[in-house]
Amino acid sequence: MSEFAIRNMDQVAPVSNMYRGMLKRQPAFDTFDSSNSLFAGYFLSLNEDQTLQEVPTGFDSTSYESNNCELPLLTPCSKAVMSQALKDTFSGFTKEQCRLGIPNNPWLWTEQHVCQWLAWATNEFSLANVNIHQFLMSGQDLCNLGKERFLELAPDYVGDILWEHLEQMIKDSQEKTQDQYVESSHLTSVPHWVNNNSLTVNVDQTPYGIQMPGYPKALSYPKPNLLSDICQTSTGPNLLSPEQDFSLFPKTQVDAVSVNYCTVNQDFTRSNLNLLIDNSGKLREHESSESGAESYESSDSMLQSWNSQSSLVDLQRVPSYESFEDDCSQSLCMSKPTMSFKDYIQDRSDPVEQGKPVIPAAILAGFTGSGPIQLWQFLLELLTDKSCQSFISWTGDGWEFKLADPDEVARRWGRRKNKPKMNYEKLSRGLRYYYDKNIIHKTSGKRYVYRFVCDLQNLLGYTAEELHAMLGVQPDTED
C-alpha cells in the first residue's frame, strides 16, 4: 500500500476536534497490530505531527455530557412540529363541541359557550389562575376584543395559547363556510352573490381587476348569523342582461369580506344595486382613506332611518368615525323589517337582565346587520344603562341626550373598539358625520347635547317615554 493511499485513507472521514474524543477511527485500524508492522513508525509520526498541527478551538473543553442534550435547539422544523402538536391538541375540542352543541364559529358563541371553551382549555392544558368571570361575554364581543386586550384579561403565559386556539377556530370555520359556498354556487350571477346575511365580495381577485382597498383581511371574519329569522335570499331572476358580462371571480378565490347590507325579504330590482354596480355592469370600486392611526373599520353599517322630518323611507348607512371620506351619499332602498328590536329580543327569549342595558349594542348590531358595533349603537347602550347615567343620560325631552362627561364617553368607546388614543375630538367627528344623514343632530344653544332625529321608535319598538320610565329619567330642568 502506497504512502499516498494511506494518507487518503486517513482523510476519509475528517472529524472536528469537538468530537475527536468521542469517535473512533475506522475499525480496520483499531484491529490492526502496528507494533510489528513495517508502517509502525509512520503511524506514530503521523499522529504526532497531526497533534502538533492541531489548533485549539475552545470546543475541546466541552464535556461529553453537554453533547448529550435531550432537547435540541429550536429550528424552523422543530417549531413546525410544535405548532402541529398544538393544532392536534386543539382538535380535541371538536368532540367537546359535538357533546355540548357549541357552534364551530366563535362569533356565534353565547356566554355559556365561551365559559365551556375556557373550562375545556383549563383542563386540557392544566392552566392555573384563569378567571372565567373576566370573560363573561358573547363570542362576538370576545372576538372583537383584539389580541392585546385579550392578553390583558388572560393570565400570564396563557393568553397566547388561548388566542391562538381562538384564531384557529375562526380560520377553520371561515374556510369551511367558503368551501360550502363554492360547492353550492359557481358565482356566475348576482342571485348567487347575495348571501343570507350579507353581500360578499372578494378582496384578492374581483372582476375586471378591481381591488377594494381599506378592508383589513385579518378582521374579515364571518359575522354572527343573528338575522337568520328575518333575512332571506332573493330568488328572483338574474338582474343583469346577457350583454353585461358579470362573471364573478373564480372558485379558488373566495376570501369574503362582509359589505353588511341586510337583505330583509326584498324584491331586488336593478335600482337596488346602484351602490354596487355602475352603468356598465361592473362592480364599483370602494375607496377609503387612512389618516394617522385611524383605519377603515370593516364597512358602513345601516340604521333604519324613517325620518319624520323628511320623506325618506329607506335605510340610512351609518359609518364608523374612521370612514368619513367614504362615499355614503346614496342609500340602498329596502322595505322596512317585519319586526322591531323589542320583538326581536322577545323572540330570542333574551329578557332584559337587572343592571344590564335595555339595548345591548352587540345584539342591536346583529339586528341591524351592521357587523362591528357602531357609535350610534354604543351610545344607545350607554343611554339605556342606569350605571352610566353619571356621564351620559337622556334629558327627558324625547330622544335628546347629554354627554355630562364627554371624555368618559370617549374613553369607553375607545376601550370597546380597542383604540386607546380615542378622545372626545375624534368622537365628536363621528357625531358630526351623522348630521347630514339625519341620524343625530346637535341641539343648538346647549353644550354636549344631541338628539336622535331618525325614527328610533319604529326601529327599537320603544317610545322615548317608555325608555325614560324604565330608566327612571327625570326631565332636565337646566337651560
UniProtKB/Swiss-Prot annotation:
Keyword field: DNA-binding, Nucleus, Proto-oncogene, Transcription, Transcription regulation
GO terms for cellular component: cytosol; nucleoplasm; nucleus; plasma membrane
Domain PNT: 88-173
Cross-referenced SUPFAM superfamilies: SAM/Pointed domain, Winged helix' DNA-binding domain
GO MF, any single term: RNA polymerase II-specific DNA-binding transcription factor binding
Disulfide bonds: none
Transmembrane segments: none
Biological process per Gene Ontology, one example term: ectodermal cell fate commitment
Role of this protein: Probable transcription factor.
Entry similarity comment: Belongs to the ETS family.
Name of the featured protein: Protein C-ets-2
Species this chain originates from: Gallus gallus (Chicken)
